[in-house]
């Protein structure tokens, strides 16, 4: 099997992603024909008024930015999950294994509860708090893991990450008990939602995925070496500690940005890489790009279900991913135990 996908394969991935995005833009409480959707988008790009009867505002200003943000978050979370599973050699690992998702959620909840803002930006305070707490969480977890084992052993990182996530979850629930007027909005956000996100979020998510995704993909060869064990990776010239720190920090930054925009969305980084591995195989030079495309499509479909299943009531996207992910988690866990 080739190390990289052919241009034809990438073209198929892109077409599948565009088809999913078109479906999500067209379908909703108000259905819009694909032709009208394309007309509205082209008119917006060219700065021309849309023909009468075309819901340009709904398409261009509401659905399109949301769909783009959903795709970017899905791609980012899935990429982080694939990287963590390769780095930690654990099929049950994803970005949240580090406890970084929980830490970022705590920072964002504190910002929302206290009304932390930055002049000129409605969401800048939440994003900075989420990223800051993601870094603090990573620093704390790695410090504790290093204290237990100077080699930063995988089992130590996972164990401390899980314990930290449970502790942070309790702290978040404690905070929610003191913010009466904001409990509903914060609780909905913590379950994952991209409702109300716009193009500024798209620019931030795109930049984060471009920079952090580039770093992760550049370590694909090292992640392949980790598959045969850390000792063997050292023997083939991999600086294990440097690669671990680089990937862990990059994953933390990317997760922090995603959580600040979408809230905590579970199971994407756990389930999607396994599905992508069935298509692309274990080679991370193929697996990482496949995971990004698959993650984007998966979260787009989950968001579509969340918007339309009980319309006009909108479900949290995290509810949908958890329902699917919980079943998949049990299957993955059973297979891992059976194989082990």
Label the predicted regions.
Residues 1-340:
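Alpha-helical transmembrane segments in inner-membrane proteins
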């Amino acid at each position: 099997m080739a190390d990289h996908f052919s241009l034809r394969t990438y073209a198929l991935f892109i077409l599948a992603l565009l088809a999913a995005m078109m479906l999500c833009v067209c379908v909703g409480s108000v259905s819009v024909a694909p032709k009208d959707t394309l007309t509205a988008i082209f008119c917006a790009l060219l700065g021309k008024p849309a023909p009468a009867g075309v819901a340009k505002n709904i398409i261009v200003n509401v659905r399109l930015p949301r769909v783009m943000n959903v795709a970017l978050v899905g791609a980012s979370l899935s990429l982080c999950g694939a990287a963590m599973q390769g780095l930690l050699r654990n099929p049950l690992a994803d970005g949240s294994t580090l406890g970084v998702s929980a830490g970022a959620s705590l920072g964002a909840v504190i910002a929302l509860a206290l009304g932390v803002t930055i002049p000129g930006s409605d969401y800048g305070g939440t994003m900075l708090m989420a990223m800051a707490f993601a870094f603090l969480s990573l620093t704390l977890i790695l410090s504790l893991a290093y204290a237990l084992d100077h080699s930063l052993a995988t089992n130590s990182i996972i164990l401390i990450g899980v314990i930290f996530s449970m502790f942070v979850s309790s702290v978040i629930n404690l905070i929610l008990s003191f913010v009466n007027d904001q409990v509903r909005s914060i609780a909905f956000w913590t379950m994952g939602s991209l409702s109300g996100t716009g193009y500024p979020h798209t620019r931030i998510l795109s930049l984060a995925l471009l920079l952090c995704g580039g770093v992760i993909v550049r370590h694909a060869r090292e992640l392949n070496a980790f598959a045969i064990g850390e000792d063997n990776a050292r023997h083939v010239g991999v600086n294990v500690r440097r690669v671990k720190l680089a990937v862990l920090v990059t994953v933390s930054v990317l997760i922090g940005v995603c959580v600040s925009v979408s809230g905590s969305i579970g199971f994407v980084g756990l389930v999607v890489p396994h599905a992508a591995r069935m298509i692309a195989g274990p080679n991370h030079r193929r697996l990482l790009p496949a995971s990004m495309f698959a993650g984007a499509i998966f979260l787009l479909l989950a968001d579509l279900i969340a918007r339309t299943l009980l319309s006009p009531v909108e479900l949290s996207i995290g509810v949908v991913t958890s329902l699917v992910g919980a079943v998949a988690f049990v299957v993955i866990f059973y297979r891992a135990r059976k194989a082990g």
